[in-house]
Structures are given as structure tokens and as C-alpha cells.
């Protein structure tokens, strides 16, 4: 499932926000919320930030944190409301306001409130210094509004400001969501002209070749990444093998990822489930999904639960598939593909 990247503005700010002015219970609650947010425990982070808001402790920062947590949980209107409250907080400084504007624009983009998202992007451009992330965000909003020239201009500025493999891949993925891969491929090609230095570089190069369906070079780069101890490289190698229809080697990579990753194996189990689906081993796929859900983040849970629906469809158990997609949409109501799937399953169940 393709999901738009959540813009991670001001990641250094998370560390800065750990500095607190006084001790006691309120400080501990706030600090724990910050830690939970960094670790991807968004439900816990949200509860902590809500407690901080109620206590009036670091209110602007707490509204920001609650907004980000809600954004990751898929509660986009809640995210907008929290971030708006933070922006209206008289204690919010200029840097924090820019950060919250960017997150609010992201939530508005995901809610398809494109005019509001673009208005926030324009406020950032008028009142603050633009950077690679804000150019990228503006490009995503423009692309969603079918303003292709404006999107291209902002993506070019984003890549000029940050010529990393990661930025090139993110721009490509934005175009991929609009079925405009050709427009994004040039960024991948440009990035691949630079020399890899680190494990992350080799991993990103492998991902770029994977998107370009150059699986031979993808395996070469990812093997080098794995040799440099990249666990993500193992996962991506599994994706490359699966794309080639080699589920045996894909399965071996996903199993290696699970064993290497240890505390966060959900993506590996999801990969195993996809291999089992391809091989027609549907009960095994359900077992893999169950194992993955035990330690899944919100984003990982979304993939696993959606694939669970797919498995029940493959088993021709449309009643269970319908029940599962209804549960899924309660958690992720903005997933358009799932909404279409609901209509299909209702038709198969006489709805």
C-alpha cells in the first residue's frame, strides 16, 4: 500500500523539547510523551500530551505533539485541531509555529483539504525561510491539486536544497502516487550519478533501482548495504526477490530480517505473508499476520490488517473479509482503496 510520507519537520526539535523548566509529575509526563512519540508509540504519546495540555505544561509544544501523534494515528481532523490550538498559543515561538504549520498542512493534505493546505504552505513561504522539507510539502500539495508546473518547481527546489538519495526517492514516490512515475524517475537517475559512501546510501540506491525495475543492480547495491550491516537492506532484498517471483529467496530475506531486527519484526512478517499469498498458502499468511501484529507500529499495523482482508478474499471467505474491512476502516477511515474494497465486498455479500 502506498502511503504519503508524513513530513517530519524539525526532528531536531524533538530533542530540544526534552529541555524542561521545572520538575515534578508534569515534567515526567511530558518527557515520557516526547519519548513515546520518538519511538512511534503514538497512542501513548497522545495520552501524555493530552495530560500535559490539561495541566497547562508546555502547552504549545504539547499541542504540537498531540497533533503529530494524531496525524500518525490517521486522526487528521484531530491533528488539525491540536495544531491550530498550538498555533494560537501565545507561548509558541516562530520556529515552533513554522513546524506546526507544516504538520497542519500535511494533515490537511491527507484530509484532501487542499486549499487549506496550500494556504499554510504559502504562509510558510511568506513568513519563514523555505527549506527542502517545506518545498517538498508544497510540491505534494500542488501535485494533489493537479498544479503540475508548480509541483515540479517546488520539487526541483527541494532537491536543489537536499540532493540526498532519500529526497530523490520521496519525490519519486509522490509522483508514483499520481501514476506519474516518469516525472519522478529523473530524480532517481540524477541521484544514482552520485557515489555511495554509507550503508544507507547503498540501501537507497538499491531502492531507486528497485523502483526503476532494474533488479540486477538493485540486488548488487542492497547486497553491499547488507554487508555493511543494514537491516533495511535485508528487507528490500526480500522485496526485490518477490518482485521477480522468487518467493523462496524473498522468504529467506524476510526471515533473516525478523531474526536480525528482533524487537520490531512486523515488516518481515508482512513480507512473509505476501510470499504466502503469492504461493497460495493462505493459512500460513494469516499466521504471519498475527505474529506481525504483536509488535506492529500504527503504520505497520495498517499494512498487516489490509493484507488480512486480502487473504480472506483469496480464501473466498467474503463474509469474514467484509467484517475485517469494516474494522479496518474504523481505524483508517481515510484509506480510499479500502473504501472501494468495502463496496466490492458488500456486493459479494448481497449488500
Regions found by a protein language model. Name each.
Residues 27-28, 61, 95-99, 133, ...:
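Start-of-helix register in tetratricopeptide repeats
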Residues 38-39, 72-73, 110, 144-145, ...:
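Register position in tetratricopeptide repeats
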Residues 18-21:
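C-terminal motif of bacterial Sec signal peptides marking the signal peptidase cleavage site
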Residues 65, 72, 96-103, 136-137, ...:
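Canonical tetratricopeptide repeat
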Amino acid at each position: 500500500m502506498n502511503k504519503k510520507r508524513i513530513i517530519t519537520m524539525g526532528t531536531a526539535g524533538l530533542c530540544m523539547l526534552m529541555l524542561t523548566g521545572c520538575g515534578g509529575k508534569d515534567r515526567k509526563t511530558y518527557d515520557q510523551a516526547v519519548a513515546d512519540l520518538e519511538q512511534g508509540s503514538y497512542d501513548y504519546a497522545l495520552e501524555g500530551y493530552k495530560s500535559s495540555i490539561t495541566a497547562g505544561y508546555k502547552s504549545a509544544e504539547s499541542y504540537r505533539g498531540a497533533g503529530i501523534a494524531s496525524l500518525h494515528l490517521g486522526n487528521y481532523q484531530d491533528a488539525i485541531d491540536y495544531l491550530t490550538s498550538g498555533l494560537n498559543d501565545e507561548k509558541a515561538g516562530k520556529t515552533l509555529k513554522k513546524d506546526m504549520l507544516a504538520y497542519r498542512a500535511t494533515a490537511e493534505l491527507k484530509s484532501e483539504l487542499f486549499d487549506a493546505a496550500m494556504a499554510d504552505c504559502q504562509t510558510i513561504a511568506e513568513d519563514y525561510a523555505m527549506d527542502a522539507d517545506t518545498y517538498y510539502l508544497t510540491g505534494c500539495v500542488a501535485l494533489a491539486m493537479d498544479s503540475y508546473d508548480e509541483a515540479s518547481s517546488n520539487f526541483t527546489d527541494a532537491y536543489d536544497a537536499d540532493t540526498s538519495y532519500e529526497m530523490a526517492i520521496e519525490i519519486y514516490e509522490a509522483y508514483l502516487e499520481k501514476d506519474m512515475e516518469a516525472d519522478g524517475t529523473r530524480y532517481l537517475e540524477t541521484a544514482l550519478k552520485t557515489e555511495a559512501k554509507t550503508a544507507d546510501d547503498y540501501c537507497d540506491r538499491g531502492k531507486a533501482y528497485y523502483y526503476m525495475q532494474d533488479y540486477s543492480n538493485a540486488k548488487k547495491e542492497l547486497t553491499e548495504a547488507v554487508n555493511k550491516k543494514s537491516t533495511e537492506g535485508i528487507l528490500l532484498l526480500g522485496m526485490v526477490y518477490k518482485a521477480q517471483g522468487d518467493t523462496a529467496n524473498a522468504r529467506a530475506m524476510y526471515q533473516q530480517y525478523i531474526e536480525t531486527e528482533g524487537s520490531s519484526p512486523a515488516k518481515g512478517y508482512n513480507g512473509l505473508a505476501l510470499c504466502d499469498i503469492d504461493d497460495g498458502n493462505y493459512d500460513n499468511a494469516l499466521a504471519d499476520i498475527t505474529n506481525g501484529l504483536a509488535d506492529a507500529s500504527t503504520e505497520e499495523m495498517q499494512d498487516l490488517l489490509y493484507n488480512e482482508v486480502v487473504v480472506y478474499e483469496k480464501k473466498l471467505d467474503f463474509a469474514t473479509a467484509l467484517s475485517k474491512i469494516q474494522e479496518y476502516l474504523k481505524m483508517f477511515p481515510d484509506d480510499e482503496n479500502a473504501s472501494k474494497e468495502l463496496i466490492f465486498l458488500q456486493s459479494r455479500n448481497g449488500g
